Swiss-Prot record:
Family matches, as PROSITE patterns: GAE, GAT, VHS
One Pfam entry name: VHS
Function of the protein: Plays a role in protein sorting and trafficking between the trans-Golgi network (TGN) and endosomes. Mediates the ARF-dependent recruitment of clathrin to the TGN and binds ubiquitinated proteins and membrane cargo molecules with a cytosolic acidic cluster-dileucine (DXXLL) motif. Mediates export of the GPCR receptor ADRA2B to the cell surface. Regulates retrograde transport of phosphorylated form of BACE1 from endosomes to the trans-Golgi network.
Start and end residues of each stretch annotated as Disordered: 1-22
MF GO annotations: phosphatidylinositol binding; small GTPase binding; ubiquitin binding
GO cellular component, one term: early endosome membrane
Domain VHS stretches: 36-166
Name of the protein in question: ADP-ribosylation factor-binding protein GGA2
Family as reported in the entry's similarity comment: Belongs to the GGA protein family.
GAT domain: residues covered: 190-317
Amino acid sequence: MAATAVAAGTGSPAGTESAEGGPGAAAALELWLNKATDPSMAEQDWSAIQKFCEQVNTDPSGPTHAPWLLAHKIQSPQEKEALYALTVLEICMNHCGEKFHSEVAKFRFLNELIKVLSPKYLGAWATEKVKGRVIEILFSWTVWFPEDIKIRDAYQMLKKQGIIKQDPKLPMDKILPPPSPWPKSIFDADEEKSKLLTRLLKSNHPEDLQAANRLIKNLVKEEQEKSEKVSRRVSAVEEVRSHVRVLREMLSMYRRPGHALPDQQALQVVYERCEKLRPTLFRLASDTTDDDDALAEILQANDLLTQGVRLYKQVVEGRVSAGNAVPAAVGAIPAPRAFPNPEPCGLNCPLIDLETPSLLHQDLAALGINDVPTRNQVVIPSCCNDKKQPGAITLMGGGIQSLSADRNLLDLFSPQPSPGLNYVPQKSIPKEVPPGTKASPGWSWEAGPLASSTASQNTPLAHVFVPLESVKPSSLPPIVVYDRNGFRILLHFSQTGAPGHPDVKVLLLTMMSTATQPVWDVMFQVAVPKSMRVKLQPASSSKLPAFSPLMPPAVISQTLLLDNPHKEPIRLRYKLTFNQGGQPFSEVGEVKDFPDLAVLSTA
């Protein structure tokens, strides 16, 4: 039965490849594989493995022919030959390129591995050691290649059928594939070692061949240590993002009146875990000095973690200092008005430069906001205000200006968290403003998810929060908001309104990139007519990696809440700022293609 199964699985591909690559190439592959899996050898011949990998990479038909040769060896009744073949398969998966990888990730080849495990085929004769190695390999591939759906499906099927009882614990010396492409051959990474290895392999002395085997093992071990370091980094960064996200969600409950506060013990556990992750990131950063991209990822995670810890301290301390007062927006720096007894000016009080014009002046005019502040209109920290006149400030040449006149502009003064950067007031909006945009009165501006103002708190949106995972898109087609240079933004409609506020429309922004360059520092701002209210909740991220056809595209999601009490036709202006390939972009536009309100209400 075993021989029949192998013939059925390998006959067609082998014949095809012989036509393409010729009998000589196929014979060379078989020759090196026979040497690499020779069961009479006490130890595996690493030089034969190297030659086999080189033959796969140089022979045009190698990547498609080699998997079937390996499948035949893996199904061998001799335990040692099968185990040697599985080792060769792992190494080829690491170093024989994308085409070999894609062939192995097909059901046609995966079925050959499943036959070794299934009692209906070879499972009754295969040894437990061989079956254990096959399970380890399949499980490791599901971990390292999550984008290969067929591998995951095959593994899950084996678990559902009870053939795999539980996920194996991978041994420390296991050769794992890297998350990013390695050199064509691990033996070419170090030129000196490559030359030494070539010289040793050409020697006829047994001592030199033993030295070559030791050198190959050391090279494989070094690559293995590199992959483990990458795995630790990826795991730590993902844990940071996960814990900070949970911490922010729990802290956001403080600003929702009528909602139960989060469990204090659970909140403390999440916060303490965030604190413990900081030294982990420091160690990873000190060990990652030769990879700029990896170091940037670690530093970005550290900034995100620092912001989360700082937010926890601000919310907790603000709640203690101001009784039961809740900060206007979780994530924003508490406004001076939240503290009735401000401390006197000290050494850390920021100075106000009255000579510098506001960077917002031209931006607000370009976005069509009528309440553009004058040149000298600035917001003074509460510690510098005259205590006898808390509601007014005197400016040079500007007379007495009431703070209440700036309420519609406070959204843009509220700080915005940016991964990898500390917030600097008034500098989060780039100076570049597209020329020719005329001001249009009668629009209300929403600067971002952390906006805070007395005016906004008087609206239903101030205390409305819709979790991203609860948004269910409707059947209406999305609106294309922006589509240039491979960066695309869509606006989706939700099936229902906000919980407890059915008149508040829930919309979902999705941003994705098909550009070959990464996009970062993405910030989306919106404005609606004065008769409406709009609120942007925090985005899921602010960066998109460079597009890869081998990976699923990354997406930034952001929930938008819209209150339209007068049922007027919806109009929405936006300002989009981002950095792509080192070049900053600032775009302004308007979305007019909204469906009729009657259609929206029935969607």
